[in-house]
Amino acid sequence: MPEVSIVIVCMNRPDILFPCLDSIKAHTTVSYETLVVTYLFTPENLEALRTRYPWVTIVPSTELRGFSENNNLALRQVTGKFCLILNDDTLLSMPLIDSLVADIKSLPETAAAISPCIRFKDGRIQTCGRAPWTPRRYALHYLHLVDESKPNKWNMLSPSVFRTYTLNGACFLIKTEVFRAAGWFDERFFFTPEDIALGHKLNDMGYTVWADSSVSVTHLAGGSVSALEQAIKPARVRGSMIFYGEPLWLKRFIWCYEALRAFKYFFLPRKGRNEIMRKSALNVMKAVFSEETPKEIFKRFKP
């Protein structure tokens, strides 16, 4: 039995997946297995993965699925004592997995999961521990008033291991038996907040979540806005409404905010990013009061 089962979901992007796999190989000494969910891969890219990385277990995914569903395809096959959830657009530059395994073994039995410090390519901190996410915090986040890189009660409390509250799905290590007992990722969510929801559930189950600020992983997030944003954002918002219990005040707040955004983009040239953002705002307005699932929302607005 391997010590760690590494689970990576990749949407037909070998250009970012392969460097991630190379970095795992270069910086990991604990025993591990690697399961890659090949989401909508072309036959050519699938063959390239199989040829270049024969040590990877390929988990095909050929239907429309969100992050939770895709991860769960692989999670149901894991054999390791721990699971490492890792984005395909991440790079290891230190023995991250070894360190997290050593950390969690030294923590109390109630410790269920631990995250590293997650940094952007330029070195800025994305998250290093996460506070509880409440409807109020989500509203502030919507206004760009939440900065998870700033120290607070739950973030960066020490130069090493400290207790936090919830998780960032880009990278975290979790005890497999606890993850299984939690039901893996909640498949009601299509694009977020499955990671936050998992952290909250672990706390509700009586477990604790931790972070180690002394180890970090690079998250190559960001880039240009694609046309899929007009389907991804409303699905993401709908998932958040489900997680927060469908509060009417929050739905009204988001509707008004997106109405103002749509109004702004109405006066800008309707092309490129402007048009994507205008449609995104309009689609969120339609989705926020909907009773459809996030997956149904995504299907409805997918260009």
Over which residues does each language-model region extend?
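Active-site donor/metal-binding and catalytic loop motifs
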Residues: 19, 199, 205-229, 240
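Short, acidic, metal-binding catalytic loop of nucleotide-sugar glycosyltransferases
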Residues: 22-31
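Glycine-rich, basic loop-to-helix element that forms the pyrophosphate-binding segment
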Residues: 61-78
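Short aromatic/hydrophobic "clamp" motif used to bind/position activated sugar donors
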Residues: 83
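Acidic donor-binding/catalytic loop of UDP-sugar-dependent glycosyltransferases
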Residues: 90-103
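Acidic/His-rich active-site region of diverse nucleotide-sugar glycosyltransferases
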Residues: 101-182, 196
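A short, conserved alpha-helix in the catalytic core of glycosyltransferases
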Residues: 165-216
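Non-catalytic, C-terminal membrane-associated alpha-helical segments of glycosyltransferases
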Residues: 231-239, 245-303
